[in-house]
From Swiss-Prot:
Binds directly to 23S rRNA. The L1 stalk is quite mobile in the ribosome, and is involved in E site tRNA release. The keyword tRNA-binding applies. Belongs to the universal ribosomal protein uL1 family. The lineage of its organism: Bacteria, Bacillati, Bacillota, Bacilli, Bacillales. Part of the 50S ribosomal subunit. The keyword Oxidoreductase does not apply. Signal peptide: none annotated. It comes from the Bacteria. This is Large ribosomal subunit protein uL1.
Amino acid sequence: MAKKGKKYQEAASKVDRTQHYSVEEAIKLAKETSIANFDASVEVAFRLGIDTRKNDQQIRGAVVLPNGTGKSQSVLVFAKGDKIAEAEAAGADYVGEAEYVQKIQQGWFDFDVVVATPDMMGEVGKLGRVLGPKGLMPNPKTGTVTMDVKKAVEEIKAGKVEYRAEKAGIVHASIGKVSFTDEQLIENFNTLQDVLAKAKPSSAKGTYFKSVAVTTTMGPGVKIDTASFK
């Protein structure tokens, strides 16, 4: 542990904690200070000026990042009839009806995202207490409750990420891997930031983008200057 701590301290010493960097500088620095011995994820955290206790200031949705996330997402689709073949053709890893409800109730979780057609939500609803806490419950706001299972699966496989403001108004999301080029990460970041800007509740007052930071898995955080943000 001491060795890991030393590596982190050396990496952290390259980051000026009092400075707010441009998006380009922050992403470059985050990559340079990655200490993981694997292709680490690049994560961002937006602290928004919202009150999540108010229903009209809940922020949740999904966006397809132009360069994907670098992660392979396993997709489970609850569907029936011709929607089963449609989901399979789109690349879904698992497709079915009640049999998967039973498997999940028995502790099976070999998937990352759940999609369901509206007519299956009666069955999927039985899993609310299991899927909800894990953030896996299908939701119309994120496009995971839909009859267009083809589009839903293809977007997830292409690099769609879900975002949701937590209690403190913080949105966490992955925008790629350290192996991505700076340009790919910047483009992904800008896409996510633009979506969050457009999602600003009309009732939110004061500064919206309160603070933003980028980091890699196990690496130090790098603050981003939000002055130019909309």
